[in-house]
């Protein structure tokens, strides 16, 4: 489970700009909901090789009613889940009643809060920050997110320490969890009403999860250990991710954060899609997030019963077009959670994906496969020299990590990296799991000797003169 940073504040103070800076916006997990200013964005960020999640909560106002009231509640959920809160204010506009309202909400929470005074370019930073100390938070810091002024200092000063402390505690907790973990830990993810809870009950063989024909009836993530055919599992049914424009009831808990955390905490992720609705951008966002986090993956296309053959052909074509990047290694099952059709095959794929993700590969095998791949198709030339791959070893599992050492590996094209992945996948018969390749530039063992010789020759030439 990742460390979570929540960015909060009233509208138009620069929260989205700060979000883009922290996540390098192209990495953002963005859901295509109506209303740009209302959108909450979820992004992955990295600090010193430590991953963390960032959520941009949208504007908070004391006048929120209806849909806006729902969104304000969602912002509060994000704050409750957060390990650190960046409370963004506008240094140009100064303190407003809207800021006071947000501050009053934050004071009710036992959270680490940093008041981030944005838009201070062209102003005196100390003067811009002065009035915001009245909120009662001891950490106040001035930046210009648009010009990236002081943004690195912001994370260095306020994120580094709590992030490192969190992962020290988390590593110990996770090691304990792994020891206590009940078999294969897998999560069911997807939008509301695609049948995740029905599938959970079908897998368990009993009605353990409340199911109604209404989106969002699973209010929170539910973890249930069970056993099937001698294999132990723990299943997590996450509250669904739904399109915000369709949200009408404020009691429904929109829990993207819970879903993302469940993905990170799973061995295998089962993405459940409604065959009648087709695959959406939300589905794709969650699938990409799972792959980026190295999770083994199975796809279950639910509500397959009762569809005409013509509709089934159309659904398969749509899946092939939108999930082209999964065709090579992810099992896709067409199921009926209600009637149990093909659910047994989903279990088989979960077992296979887990076994592949944890398969042990020796350094000798990794190097041999790399050499076979190079013999079949050599790396390209760079200038007058060919890129040379020397040896490989395993850098981890779940997902499998293959580390390849060589010369000029930084210039290896993506097409050749994909070739290597496909070659290893086919040779090792990997199903359901991504394979991560890392490329390391080989050190020249004679570099120091060469430098020393050059210095000696230089000294001799001086003496000759």
From Swiss-Prot:
GO terms classed as biological process: ribosome biogenesis
Domain KH-like intervals: 359-443
Keyword terms: GTP-binding, Nucleotide-binding, Repeat, Ribosome biogenesis
Molecular function via GO: GTP binding; ribosome binding
Region (Disordered), start-end ranges: 446-465
InterPro entries attached to this UniProt entry: G_ENGA, GTP-bd, GTPase_Der, KH_dom-like, KH_dom-like_a/b, P-loop_NTPase, Small_GTP-bd
Residue ranges of domain EngA-type G in the record: 3-166, 184-358
Residues annotated for GTP 2 binding in this entry: 190-197, 237-241, 302-305
Keyword Thylakoid: no
Positions annotated to bind GTP 1: 9-16, 56-60, 118-121
Pfam (any one): MMR_HSR1
Subunit structure: Associates with the 50S ribosomal subunit.
Family according to the record: Belongs to the TRAFAC class TrmE-Era-EngA-EngB-Septin-like GTPase superfamily. EngA (Der) GTPase family.
Cited function: GTPase that plays an essential role in the late steps of ribosome biogenesis.
Official protein name in the record: GTPase Der
Gene source species: Francisella tularensis subsp. tularensis (strain WY96-3418)
